[in-house]
Amino acid sequence: MGDKKDDKSSPKKSKAKERRDLDDLKKEVAMTEHKMSVEEVCRKYNTDCVQGLTHSKAQEILARDGPNALTPPPTTPEWVKFCRQLFGGFSILLWIGAILCFLAYGIQAGTEDDPSGDNLYLGIVLAAVVIITGCFSYYQEAKSSKIMESFKNMVPQQALVIREGEKMQVNAEEVVVGDLVEIKGGDRVPADLRIISAHGCKVDNSSLTGESEPQTRSPDCTHDNPLETRNITFFSTNCVEGTARGVVVATGDRTVMGRIATLASGLEVGKTPIAIEIEHFIQLITGVAVFLGVSFFILSLILGYTWLEAVIFLIGIIVANVPEGLLATVTVCLTLTAKRMARKNCLVKNLEAVETLGSTSTICSDKTGTLTQNRMTVAHMWFDNQIHEADTTEDQSGTSFDKSSHTWVALSHIAGLCNRAVFKGGQDNIPVLKRDVAGDASESALLKCIELSSGSVKLMRERNKKVAEIPFNSTNKYQLSIHETEDPNDNRYLLVMKGAPERILDRCATILLQGKEQPLDEEMKEAFQNAYLELGGLGERVLGFCHYYLPEEQFPKGFAFDCDDVNFTTDNLCFVGLMSMIDPPRAAVPDAVGKCRSAGIKVIMVTGDHPITAKAIAKGVGIISEGNETVEDIAARLNIPVSQVNPRDAKACVIHGTDLKDFTSEQIDEILQNHTEIVFARTSPQQKLIIVEGCQRQGAIVAVTGDGVNDSPALKKADIGVAMGIAGSDVSKQAADMILLDDNFASIVTGVEEGRLIFDNLKKSIAYTLTSNIPEITPFLLFIMANIPLPLGTITILCIDLGTDMVPAISLAYEAAESDIMKRQPRNPRTDKLVNERLISMAYGQIGMIQALGGFFSYFVILAENGFLPGNLVGIRLNWDDRTVNDLEDSYGQQWTYEQRKVVEFTCHTAFFVSIVVVQWADLIICKTRRNSVFQQGMKNKILIFGLFEETALAAFLSYCPGMDVALRMYPLKPSWWFCAFPYSFLIFVYDEIRKLILRRNPGGWVEKETYY
C-alpha cells in the first residue's frame, strides 16, 4: 500500500492516496511478460533459461525484494480489542453513570456529616457491570478468532528451483524474481511464472478467476489479457497435472494474488448495522435522561432546594435512566445467536455480524461450490438417437435409464477405458459419489458414473489391458487409447476415443444404433447436431465417444503401436454417443433461493464461469425464476435481433464480464434497478468489487459469498462477507465476517432468519428492560416535587436492573420467531431502527405509566396502614428525613421516631420493588410478540417461564431472608401487600392484547403507525 510513514503529516493526503491505490488495484492486471519472447524475459530479469540464477545473485535479489510471501493483514492488538469492549458503544453510558455517582458521593461526603453510601455502591456496581460484560464479549470474540487461527496451515511450502544448473528444493519464501522454477501435478505454484516449456501441464485457476475447469499451460502467448493467456501461471494456484518450467516474474505482494490480497486489506470497513443502532439508542436514552435531569434540576431550584441538593437530584435522575442490565443482555443475546448459528454450520467471527445478516437485502453469491456441489457429474447421455437423463442427485434417488442397450454397454466401455482417472486407495466402503479421485473433474465424473451404472471400472480395465495411449492435447482435442479385448476368442485390438464432439464426429464413418453399426448419413449428423446444441444450451460440457475394432490382419497380437508417429488408423471410426456433464446445484439451494425471494432478498449470481452454464444453473436453482426471460430469450422467441428488444421488457439478465468492463457506474446502476434477476458471468475479482459497490449505492445491505482469493476484496467491502470453510482460501476467510462450515448456500438463509430473529428479540428485550425505568424514575420525581418520603431507593433500583430483570430480559433471546419473520421485506436501516420513538412511547408513555401506578398504589397502602394518609404526606419530607425530629405525628396523632419512620420507608421501598416485579410479569409476557397474540405464540419458551419464577423467587428472597434489613435495607412484607399490584399487571396484559388485535385487524392503520415498534 505504499509507505504510510511519510503520510502522517496530513490525514487528507493519505486518504486521497489510499483512494488512488484502490483505484489502481481495481484496474485489471497490468503485465507485459506474456507478450515477450523467452529470450527477452531472461534478459529483463538477468537470468539464464537453462542455468538459472547464481546463488549470490539470488541472495542479492532476496535482500532487495524481501521474502516471497503476502504481507499479513494488519491485525488489531489484543489490548485494543479489550479496550474497545470496555469503552465502546453502550459501556460509555455506564461509565458516565459511574463517574456521576462517585461525583455525587463526593459532594455528599463534603457537605454532610453522615453521608449515605448509596451513590458510592451504585458507582462501584456500575463499573463492575461494565468490566464483567466487557470481559465476557472479549472472551467470545477471542474464541472465534482462535478457530480462525486454526485454519491457517503452518506447513512451510517448498519449491523446486534451478540455480547454477542444479535442481534444488528451497522454501517458497526464498524464491526470487528471475529464478527458474519447475512445477508438476499436485504442486502449488510458488510465484507468478512465465512458462518457457510445458508437458501436458494444466493448472486450476479457480481460486483466482472462479473458472472451475483446469486450464492448459504452454509457452505461447494466446491472449492479450494476462489472466487468460496460457503462458503465465499465478502464485498460489495449483498445478493439476503435467510438468512445466518457468521464469519467476513477480513475488509476494507484487504477484496478481498479492495485489488482490492488498486490495482486500486496504478497503474501508464501515460500521455494522447493529453498532449504528446501538449508537442511535444511546443517543436517544442519553437525550431523555439529560432532558429529564435538567428539567428537574431547574424545577428543584424553583422549589427552593439548595444548589448542592439540586445537583444531587440531577445526577440521581440521569443515573436512574441508565438501563444497567441492558449491556449484558445485548451481549448475551448476540452470543447465544452466534452459538446457535455455529450449530447450524455458520461460524460468526464478530458478534455484531450476526445481526447484519438479518438486515441483508441483496446476496451476491458465487456459483461454484456454493450454489453447486463443486463436483462435475454426468447429467445426460445421447445414444440410440435419444437423450437419456442421468441421476445427478446427491443420494441417487433420481431418474434411471435403460442400461441393457448394447450401445450403452459400448459407450460405458469407452468412457471407462479412455479415462486416466482412478479412485484413491482404501475407499471401498465409502459411497462411490463421496470417494476421492486422482484425475481431472470431467474424467472423475465419467469414472463415478460408469462405476455406479456398470460396476467396477478397475475390473473392466484389468480385463481390457491398455497397450497404447495418446493423451488429450489442445491441438487435436481428443484422447485415445488402444486395448486388448476381454473376449478370449477375439484377437482384435479395440481403439477407444473421446473428445470435442464435432472433432470426434468428423473422424467417424458409421454410428452405433441398437448395437448395430449404421452408415453415418446427413440425417444422423443433423440428429447429432440437435442433441449437441440442446445439451450445450443446458450449460453442460459435452464430450463425444467413438470406438473401432482394428482389423486383425493389419494389427496382429503384439503389434508395436507408435503414439508419436501414429502407425494406425484414426479415421472411419464408429460414433457411439455423447455424454454431458455439469456441476449440479446443491439439493437445498432452490428452496433457499425461494425463501430469500419471499423475504424480499435479491439473489445475484456472480461467477467466473461461462454465461450459458451460469444461466442454466441460475434457472436450475431459481435465481432466474420460471417464465422470466432475458433479452436473448425474448429475441429468440420473437425471432428478431437482440438489438431490437427493449432491455426493460426483460426481468432477468445475464451480463458478460467483458461488457461489464466498459460500463459506467450509471449503466451498472440502471441494470441493478431495472432487472430483478441478475447473473454476472465471466467476471474478474475487480468486477466483483464493482458489483458490490453498485448494490451499496442503491442503498442495499449486501452479503457476498465466496471461496477464492479473488473474492476477498468483495468479501471485505460487503456489509457481511461469507467465506467457505471447506473450499475457502485463507485470504478469503480472513476477509470474511462469517464462515459457512458446510459451504452450503442454504446455511446463509438460516443465517438470515437468525439475524432477523435476533433483531426482533433484541427489540423485545429492550422494550421489556426500558419499561421498568418509569416506575424507577417517577418515585424520585414525586419525592422532589411533592416533598413526600422517598418511595424507592437506589439500592432497590439496582436489585431490579441487575437482579430480577436480568434473566427475563435474556430469556427473550430464546423466543421463537413470529410467523411472518421470513415474509417481511428486509428492514430499511434508515427508517427501521432498533429503538424508535414508538418503542420509547410504548415503554415509557404507556406500559411504564401503568407500572408506576401499581408501585405507588402499594406505597400509599402501606403508609396508610401505618397511619400516614396520602393527604398528610405532601410536604412532610424535610421533617421525615431530619435525624433530630423524634416526635413526628401521623394522621392519627401517633408519634414516630426517626428510626421507626425509616423502617416504614424501607418497607415501602421493598413493596414498591415487589410491585415492579409483579407488573414486569405481564410486561415479559406481552413482550414475547410484536404483532401476534400471546395465545397464538404459546408459552413454549422454557427459559422465559424459568425467568418468571426466578424473578419472583429472587424478590421473595430479598424480602424475607434474615439479615437483608441490614445488608440491603429490605424488609419482610405482609402477604396481602404482594397483591396490590396484581390488578395493574392484569390491566397491562389486557391493554396490550387489545392493541395487537387492532394491529392485526387493521394493518397500516393509526394504531400501527403510533405503537408498532
Curated annotation (Swiss-Prot):
According to the UniProt record, what class of enzyme is this? translocase
Q: How does it sit in the membrane?
A: Multi-pass membrane protein
Q: Where in the cell? A: Cell membrane
PROSITE patterns attached here? ATPASE_E1_E2
Q: Where is this region: Interaction with phosphoinositide-3 kinase?
A: 72-74
Tell me which residues bear Phosphoserine.
S37, S56, S218, S265, S442, S933
* SUPFAM superfamilies registered for this protein in UniProt: Calcium ATPase, transduction domain A (SSF81653), Calcium ATPase, transmembrane domain M (SSF81665), HAD-like (SSF56784), Metal cation-transporting ATPase, ATP-binding domain N (SSF81660)
Protein name, as recorded: Sodium/potassium-transporting ATPase subunit alpha-3
Please spell out the taxonomic lineage of the organism that makes this protein: Eukaryota, Metazoa, Chordata, Craniata, Vertebrata
